[in-house]
Amino acid sequence: NGEKYLVESIESVLNQTYKNFELLIIDDFSNDQSVKIIKSFNDKRIQIIQNPKNLGQSITMNIGLQLARGTYIARLDQDDLCQKERLKKQLEFLLKYDYSIVGSWVIKINKNSKIIGYYHHPTNNEEIVNAMGINSALAHSSVMMRKKDILSIGGYSEKYKIVMDWDLWIRAIKHGFKIGNIAEYLISARMHNEQ
Protein backbone atom coordinates (compact mmCIF):
# COMPACT_ATOMS: atom_id res chain seq x y z
CA ASN A 1 0.00 0.00 0.00
CA GLY A 2 2.40 2.64 -1.20
CA GLU A 3 0.33 4.63 -3.68
CA LYS A 4 0.99 7.99 -2.03
CA TYR A 5 4.71 8.08 -2.88
CA LEU A 6 4.96 5.45 -5.61
CA VAL A 7 5.05 7.71 -8.68
CA GLU A 8 7.88 9.80 -7.26
CA SER A 9 9.81 6.69 -6.26
CA ILE A 10 9.45 4.97 -9.66
CA GLU A 11 10.39 8.16 -11.50
CA SER A 12 13.55 8.45 -9.39
CA VAL A 13 14.63 5.04 -10.71
CA LEU A 14 13.62 5.62 -14.32
CA ASN A 15 15.54 8.94 -14.33
CA GLN A 16 18.88 7.32 -13.46
CA THR A 17 21.90 8.34 -15.54
CA TYR A 18 22.67 4.60 -15.86
CA LYS A 19 19.93 3.19 -18.09
CA ASN A 20 20.64 -0.54 -18.52
CA PHE A 21 18.52 -2.02 -15.75
CA GLU A 22 15.30 -3.90 -15.09
CA LEU A 23 12.90 -2.42 -12.54
CA LEU A 24 11.25 -5.34 -10.81
CA ILE A 25 8.35 -4.17 -8.65
CA ILE A 26 6.69 -6.71 -6.39
CA ASP A 27 3.25 -5.82 -5.09
CA ASP A 28 2.65 -7.67 -1.82
CA PHE A 29 -1.14 -7.91 -2.24
CA SER A 30 -1.86 -4.20 -1.79
CA ASN A 31 -5.45 -3.00 -1.56
CA ASP A 32 -4.88 0.53 -2.86
CA GLN A 33 -4.14 1.84 -6.37
CA SER A 34 -0.47 0.74 -6.39
CA VAL A 35 -0.83 -1.80 -9.21
CA LYS A 36 -2.78 0.64 -11.37
CA ILE A 37 -0.09 3.28 -10.81
CA ILE A 38 2.72 0.88 -11.72
CA LYS A 39 0.92 -0.25 -14.87
CA SER A 40 0.45 3.38 -15.94
CA PHE A 41 4.19 3.68 -16.62
CA ASN A 42 5.00 2.91 -20.23
CA ASP A 43 8.55 1.66 -19.79
CA LYS A 44 9.65 -1.80 -20.90
CA ARG A 45 12.24 -1.93 -18.11
CA ILE A 46 9.41 -2.26 -15.57
CA GLN A 47 8.25 -5.73 -14.62
CA ILE A 48 5.48 -6.09 -12.06
CA ILE A 49 4.93 -9.19 -9.95
CA GLN A 50 1.76 -9.48 -7.87
CA ASN A 51 1.78 -11.76 -4.84
CA PRO A 52 -1.44 -13.84 -4.60
CA LYS A 53 -1.67 -12.92 -0.90
CA ASN A 54 0.33 -10.81 1.55
CA LEU A 55 3.57 -12.72 2.06
CA GLY A 56 5.55 -10.16 4.05
CA GLN A 57 8.75 -8.31 3.28
CA SER A 58 11.32 -11.11 3.68
CA ILE A 59 9.53 -13.60 1.44
CA THR A 60 8.76 -10.88 -1.10
CA MET A 61 12.40 -9.77 -1.25
CA ASN A 62 13.50 -13.37 -1.78
CA ILE A 63 11.03 -13.65 -4.66
CA GLY A 64 12.68 -10.56 -6.13
CA LEU A 65 16.15 -12.04 -5.71
CA GLN A 66 15.08 -15.20 -7.52
CA LEU A 67 13.29 -13.42 -10.38
CA ALA A 68 15.78 -10.62 -11.01
CA ARG A 69 17.89 -11.26 -14.10
CA GLY A 70 20.76 -8.93 -13.24
CA THR A 71 24.11 -9.66 -11.65
CA TYR A 72 23.58 -6.81 -9.20
CA ILE A 73 20.46 -6.04 -7.16
CA ALA A 74 19.66 -2.52 -5.97
CA ARG A 75 16.65 -2.24 -3.71
CA LEU A 76 14.40 0.67 -2.87
CA ASP A 77 11.32 1.01 -0.70
CA GLN A 78 8.19 2.39 -2.34
CA ASP A 79 8.38 5.69 -0.46
CA ASP A 80 12.11 6.38 -0.90
CA LEU A 81 13.96 8.10 -3.75
CA CYS A 82 17.16 7.46 -5.71
CA GLN A 83 19.47 10.30 -6.60
CA LYS A 84 20.16 10.38 -10.36
CA GLU A 85 23.63 8.79 -10.20
CA ARG A 86 22.89 6.13 -7.58
CA LEU A 87 22.99 3.08 -9.87
CA LYS A 88 26.00 4.34 -11.83
CA LYS A 89 28.09 5.07 -8.74
CA GLN A 90 27.22 1.86 -6.92
CA LEU A 91 27.81 -0.28 -10.00
CA GLU A 92 31.20 1.40 -10.56
CA PHE A 93 32.08 0.68 -6.91
CA LEU A 94 31.20 -3.01 -7.15
CA LEU A 95 33.04 -3.39 -10.46
CA LYS A 96 36.17 -1.76 -9.00
CA TYR A 97 36.26 -3.31 -5.51
CA ASP A 98 35.82 -6.83 -4.16
CA TYR A 99 32.76 -5.96 -2.07
CA SER A 100 29.44 -7.81 -2.02
CA ILE A 101 27.21 -5.04 -0.68
CA VAL A 102 27.43 -1.28 -1.00
CA GLY A 103 25.14 1.35 0.47
CA SER A 104 25.40 5.11 0.76
CA TRP A 105 24.80 8.06 2.98
CA VAL A 106 21.16 9.10 3.29
CA ILE A 107 19.15 12.28 2.95
CA LYS A 108 16.18 12.12 5.33
CA ILE A 109 13.00 13.64 3.87
CA ASN A 110 9.49 14.15 5.21
CA LYS A 111 6.13 13.25 3.68
CA ASN A 112 6.38 16.35 1.45
CA SER A 113 9.89 15.45 0.19
CA LYS A 114 11.48 18.27 2.18
CA ILE A 115 14.92 17.60 3.64
CA ILE A 116 14.79 17.10 7.41
CA GLY A 117 18.27 15.70 8.01
CA TYR A 118 21.17 13.57 6.89
CA TYR A 119 22.58 10.25 7.96
CA HIS A 120 26.26 9.34 7.61
CA HIS A 121 26.95 5.62 7.82
CA PRO A 122 30.47 4.25 8.28
CA THR A 123 32.09 3.75 4.89
CA ASN A 124 34.72 1.01 5.02
CA ASN A 125 34.24 -2.66 5.79
CA GLU A 126 36.11 -2.60 9.11
CA GLU A 127 34.05 0.33 10.46
CA ILE A 128 30.82 -1.32 9.33
CA VAL A 129 31.74 -4.65 10.94
CA ASN A 130 32.52 -2.85 14.21
CA ALA A 131 29.27 -0.86 14.08
CA MET A 132 27.05 -3.89 13.43
CA GLY A 133 26.90 -4.72 17.13
CA ILE A 134 25.22 -1.37 17.78
CA ASN A 135 23.10 -0.75 14.68
CA SER A 136 22.68 -1.84 11.09
CA ALA A 137 25.29 0.59 9.65
CA LEU A 138 23.51 0.41 6.27
CA ALA A 139 20.29 1.95 5.03
CA HIS A 140 18.42 -1.00 3.54
CA SER A 141 16.91 1.12 0.76
CA SER A 142 20.39 2.29 -0.25
CA VAL A 143 22.05 -1.05 -0.95
CA MET A 144 23.26 -2.63 -4.15
CA MET A 145 24.30 -6.27 -3.77
CA ARG A 146 26.01 -8.97 -5.80
CA LYS A 147 23.13 -11.35 -6.42
CA LYS A 148 25.24 -14.54 -6.39
CA ASP A 149 26.76 -13.68 -3.00
CA ILE A 150 23.40 -12.97 -1.40
CA LEU A 151 21.87 -16.15 -2.81
CA SER A 152 24.90 -18.16 -1.62
CA ILE A 153 24.00 -17.31 1.99
CA GLY A 154 20.32 -18.07 1.54
CA GLY A 155 18.98 -14.58 0.85
CA TYR A 156 16.77 -12.96 3.47
CA SER A 157 15.81 -15.05 6.49
CA GLU A 158 12.06 -15.56 6.33
CA LYS A 159 11.79 -15.99 10.10
CA TYR A 160 12.08 -12.21 10.61
CA LYS A 161 9.30 -9.65 10.12
CA ILE A 162 11.69 -6.79 10.98
CA VAL A 163 15.51 -6.44 11.01
CA MET A 164 15.80 -8.95 8.17
CA ASP A 165 18.34 -6.64 6.59
CA TRP A 166 20.52 -6.53 9.72
CA ASP A 167 20.44 -10.33 9.83
CA LEU A 168 21.51 -10.47 6.17
CA TRP A 169 24.43 -8.10 6.77
CA ILE A 170 25.61 -10.14 9.79
CA ARG A 171 25.48 -13.39 7.79
CA ALA A 172 27.32 -11.75 4.89
CA ILE A 173 30.09 -10.63 7.25
CA LYS A 174 30.31 -14.12 8.79
CA HIS A 175 30.79 -15.55 5.29
CA GLY A 176 33.67 -13.15 4.63
CA PHE A 177 31.80 -10.81 2.27
CA LYS A 178 32.83 -7.15 2.39
CA ILE A 179 30.33 -4.34 2.92
CA GLY A 180 30.86 -0.65 2.22
CA ASN A 181 29.04 2.64 2.02
CA ILE A 182 29.79 5.33 -0.55
CA ALA A 183 30.35 8.65 1.22
CA GLU A 184 27.73 10.40 -0.90
CA TYR A 185 23.99 10.95 -0.56
CA LEU A 186 22.60 8.52 -3.13
CA ILE A 187 19.12 8.01 -1.68
CA SER A 188 16.46 9.99 0.11
CA ALA A 189 14.70 7.99 2.83
CA ARG A 190 11.23 9.20 3.69
CA MET A 191 10.27 9.55 7.35
CA HIS A 192 6.52 9.62 7.95
CA ASN A 193 3.91 8.22 10.31
CA GLU A 194 2.50 5.71 7.79
CA GLN A 195 5.52 3.39 7.96
Residue ranges and their predicted role:
Residues 4-7, 32-40, 81, 85:
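Acidic helix N-cap motif at the loop->helix transition within catalytic regions
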Residues 11-20:
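Short, acidic, metal-binding catalytic loop of nucleotide-sugar glycosyltransferases
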Residues 27-36, 53, 77:
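A conserved acidic beta->alpha catalytic loop
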Residues 51-68, 89:
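Glycine-rich, basic loop-to-helix element that forms the pyrophosphate-binding segment
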Residues 66, 118, 122-195:
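Conserved nucleotide-sugar donor-binding catalytic segment
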Residues 73:
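Short aromatic/hydrophobic "clamp" motif used to bind/position activated sugar donors
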Residues 77-81, 105:
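The conserved acidic donor/metal-binding loop of glycosyltransferases
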Residues 85-116:
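Conserved donor NDP-sugar-binding/catalytic core segment of glycosyltransferases
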